[in-house]
Amino acid sequence: MHLARVTGAVVSTQKSPSLIGKKLLLVRRVSADGELPASPTSGDEVAVDSVGAGVGELVLLSGGSSARHVFSGPNEAIDLAVVGIVDTLSC
C-alpha cells in the first residue's frame, strides 16, 4: 500500500462497464510524513474510490490484483484503488 493525497476528480462518460457507477479520483503519492514532494518523482494517477474520499484528503492506495478484489472480483478493470482515509499519521 501507498500513501497519497487526493488532488482532484475524474469524470469519464465513456468507460469500461465495470467502472460504471464508480467514483474516480486523481491522486498523487506522498512522502512518509504525508506531504507532497517538492519535486514529484511521478505524476498524478487515477484511482477508483471505495471509501468516499474527497479532494485534499490523505488516503491509502492499493494496487494491482488487490485493488480489483476491493470491488466485486478479479475481472474488474481496476489497477489502483483508494482503500482508506488516513485520520492521523505519526513518523
Curated annotation (Swiss-Prot):
Q: Where does the UniProt annotation locate this protein?
A: Bacterial microcompartment
CDD domains xrefs: EutN_CcmL (cd01614)
Which pathway is recorded for this entry? Polyol metabolism; 1,2-propanediol degradation
Domain BMV, first and last residues per copy: 1-87
* InterPro entries assigned: EutN_CcmL, EutN_CcmL_sf
Instruction: Tell me the superkingdom of the source.
Output: Bacteria
The answer to whether UniProt assigns keyword Transmembrane to this entry is no
The effect of disrupting this gene, in the record's words, is: Forms BMCs with a variety of morphologies, including elongated, enlarged, and aggregated MCPs and some with rounded cross-sections. Grows in an interrupted manner on 1,2-PD and vitamin B12; grows for a while then stops, then restarts as if a toxic compound was accumulating and then decreases.
Keywords annotated in UniProt: Bacterial microcompartment
One GO CC term, this protein: propanediol degradation polyhedral organelle
Q: What induces it?
A: BMC production is induced by growth on 1,2-PD vitamin B12 medium.
Q: How is it used?
A: Artificial BMCs can be made in E.coli by expressing pduA-pduB/B'-pduT-pduU-pduN-pduJ-pduK (in this order). Enzymes can be targeted to the BMC, and appear to be encapsulated within it.
An example GO BP is: propanediol catabolic process
Assigned protein family? Belongs to the CcmL/EutN family.
Give a short account of what the protein does. Answer: Probably forms vertices in the shell of the bacterial microcompartment (BMC) dedicated to 1,2-propanediol (1,2-PD) degradation. Required for structural integrity of BMCs and to mitigate propionaldehyde toxicity.
Q: What else is known?
A: Bacterial microcompartments (BMC) 100-200 nm in cross section are formed during aerobic growth on minimal 1,2-PD-B12 or anaerobic growth on 1,2-PD-tetrathionate medium, but not during aerobic growth on glucose, anerobic growth on glucose or pyruvate-tetrathionate. BMCs can constitute up to 10% of total cell protein.
Q: How does it assemble?
A: Homopentamer. Interacts with shell protein PduA.
Protein name in UniProt: Bacterial microcompartment shell vertex protein PduN
The species is Salmonella typhimurium (strain LT2 / SGSC1412 / ATCC 700720)
Report the gene name. Answer: pduN
